[in-house]
Swiss-Prot record:
Location within or outside the cell: Secreted
Tissue spec. comment: Pods.
Induction: Upon contact with the plant pathogen fungus Fusarium solani.
Protein family according to the UniProt entry: Belongs to the DEFL family.
A UniProt-annotated Pfam family: Gamma-thionin
Protein name as catalogued: Defensin-like protein 39
PANTHER family membership: DEFENSIN, DEFENSIN-LIKE PROTEIN 1
SUPFAM superfamilies tied to this protein: Scorpion toxin-like (SSF57095)
Gene that this polypeptide is encoded by: PI39
Function: Possesses antifungal activity.
UniProt-listed GO biological process terms: defense response to fungus; killing of cells of another organism
Amino acid sequence: MEKKSLAALSFLLLLVLFVAQEIVVTEANTCEHLADTYRGVCFTNASCDDHCKNKAHLISGTCHDWKCFCTQNC
């Protein structure tokens, strides 16, 4: 009985490691670039994020050095 539970535990551990490895491999590369259509000083990440998602149709946006940068898949 002890061998069966050890085998089941080993199988579950290998399954978890395999799934975790697959998640890392399938992650997309992203690139960040200056939002050329954003106007004004970037004060809040929310306004930049809204612009990048809704106007530029990209993944997200954040403010860096008072400028809006959009994130997209490379």
